[in-house]
């Protein structure tokens, strides 16, 4: 097969991969909706404020659900961040990105199986799955870069910036694994605090080393 034909095949395969991943993430978001408080029995009608009271009674579970949706959204954003600079893909890169998606689906399993974090396995499993999926995605990016799959318009500085920004998500998840052993509140707060600390630290390091943001 000629070089041009291979490039054309790689470009089409990348488009199909992007479409498949977007559809898969859409399905994941639909799954989260299914775990909203049940309203079919109309028991909420007897509550003082109706549906609002139902949401208040389930506020703890809803908070965890919102966090799970947010983390899935971050994973989707990470996926786009790692695919947007690419011009084409191949079988190995596609496999790595599908493995990245499988790990996100495994995160969903831990998130919806124990939304109240009754057992330690749920927060630890969620954190490790997101960390692993992020690092696999970054590994796929480095592979694609070495193979020359990136857009020709990108400079080396642009390519380095992709990895520097993408690493925040998996580092947050990996660091927050330790907070899972402290307790559910610490683990929940970790998702909000750790990224801020990491981003601030990265910017300070970039200023000291003279790197552009």
What function would you assign to each model-found segment?
Residues 2-213:
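Multi-pass alpha-helical transmembrane bundle typical of ion/small-solute transporters
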């Amino acid at each position: 097969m000629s070089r041009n034909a291979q490039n054309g095949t790689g470009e089409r395969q990348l488009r199909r991969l992007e479409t498949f991943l977007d559809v898969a993430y859409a399905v994941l978001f639909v799954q989260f909706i299914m775990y909203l408080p049940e309203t079919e029995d109309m028991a909420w009608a007897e509550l003082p404020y109706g549906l609002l009271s139902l949401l208040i009674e389930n506020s703890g579970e809803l908070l965890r659900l919102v966090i799970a949706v947010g983390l899935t959204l971050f994973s989707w954003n990470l996926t786009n961040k790692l695919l947007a600079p690419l011009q084409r893909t191949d079988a190995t890169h596609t496999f790595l990105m599908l493995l990245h998606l499988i790990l996100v689906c495994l995160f969903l399993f831990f998130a919806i199986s124990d939304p109240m974090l009754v057992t330690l396995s749920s927060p630890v499993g969620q954190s490790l799955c997101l960390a692993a999926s992020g690092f696999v995605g970054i590994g796929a990016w480095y592979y694609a870069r070495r193979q020359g799959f990136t857009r020709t318009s990108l400079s080396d500085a642009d390519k380095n910036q992709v990895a520097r920004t993408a690493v925040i998500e998996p580092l947050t998840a990996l660091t927050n694994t330790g907070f899972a052993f402290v307790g559910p509140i610490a683990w929940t707060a970790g998702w909000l605090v750790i990224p801020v600390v990491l981003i601030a630290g990265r910017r300070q390091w970039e200023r000291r080393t003279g790197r552009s943001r």
